[in-house]
């Protein structure tokens, strides 16, 4: 994680100028080999970055990373977080398409606001859900960074 920190900081700064939409942290597959391990990993990632935030962020819990309304906070930034890991089957919305790695994707709130300043239109939401359904992976909008089931 130490090696990723400079690129994490840079990506979040670039989100403010529109040069980036977020950051993807690639971790070894074992970090997401089971749902329980993925929860532990995500809590550890949030805590590690949070400890390096100004202001310093309080520790998070498993309940935080499974809460669909939870946003990751770092400094003045907020990001919606999704995890893709080997523990998810092909029909799951968080399936990693056969990649052996675990990915933690931080989508900065500015990425949403640039495209849809008020809120994401209903038509866009429907199109996203339809695309997921057509791919056999029903879109699940009520899951947190880590879903509560695999």
Mark where each language-model region is.
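Long acidic/polar interaction regions in large eukaryotic complex-forming proteins
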Residues: 1-66
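Short secondary-structure junctions and interdomain/linker hinges
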Residues: 15-19, 88, 135-142
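Eukaryotic short linear interaction motifs
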Residues: 32, 88-91, 113
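Surface-exposed beta-strand edges and their flanking turn/coil or helix-capping segments
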Residues: 38-40, 87, 94-96, 117-121
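Aromatic/basic-lined ligand-recognition segments
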Residues: 60-106
């Amino acid at each position: 994680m130490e090696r990723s920190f400079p690129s994490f900081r840079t990506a979040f700064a670039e989100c403010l100028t529109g040069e980036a939409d977020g950051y993807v942290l690639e971790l070894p597959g074992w970090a997401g080999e089971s749902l329980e391990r993925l929860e532990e990993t995500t809590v550890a990632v949030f805590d590690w970055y949070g400890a390096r935030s100004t202001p310093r962020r309080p520790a998070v819990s498993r309940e935080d990373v499974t809460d669909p309304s939870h946003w990751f906070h770092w400094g003045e930034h907020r990001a919606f977080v999704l995890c893709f890991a080997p523990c998810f089957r092909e029909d799951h919305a968080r399936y990693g398409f056969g990649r052996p790695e675990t990915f933690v994707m931080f989508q900065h709130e500015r990425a949403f606001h640039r495209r849809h300043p008020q809120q994401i239109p209903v038509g866009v939401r429907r199109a996203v859900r339809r695309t997921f359904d057509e791919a056999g992976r029903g879109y699940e909008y009520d899951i947190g960074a880590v879903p509560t089931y695999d």
